[in-house]
Amino acid sequence: PETHEIVREGIESFYLLAVDVARIGCQTVCVVIKVFPNDTEWHFNVVNIYILGKNDSEKVFDHQVLELKRLMEKFHPREVVIDINGLGVSFADLMIKETFDYERNIVLPAYGFSNRDEYEGIQPRGCEKILYGIKATGQINSDMHSTLFAKVYSGAIKFLISEQEAKVKLMSTKAGQKMK
């Protein structure tokens, strides 16, 4: 897994972060994707997956937003896609504000949405607009599933480990043994 931006000379690439927002009883997940664009088809590597707010005291959105902004510092993503349905709206509201990092005694910047008109008047002027908010509907979910399925099976998306490695690891656990 990659833990920060890695730039290789002569290889065009950039990072995307995708965030599914959750709170009590569930986990907010940030998937780090490295994109390799070319003339005919883009390729995608999932290079890391982070859980934001690993324990109960860190599940509050203030802390999750701080963790995400720290990841943004490390990966310098071109875009950060956030699920802003339901609870995600509160998360989004904090992303458009500055965040104080108490551990490092610094202020992390506010970011803006590039695609959501409802944030245009309230996000800070001049902020970097790299947030992309998704309010999924049944149709959008269906379209995303179809596109993802096609990309995975065409080989355009690579994961942290292969399907075979994942099966071997899963089957070596007690939970995996119950799936036989």
Where are the regions that the model predicts?
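RNase H-like, metal-dependent nuclease domains and their acidic two-metal-ion catalytic environment used
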Residues: 1-114, 142, 146, 150, ...
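Conserved RecA-like helicase motor-core motifs
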Residues: 102-135
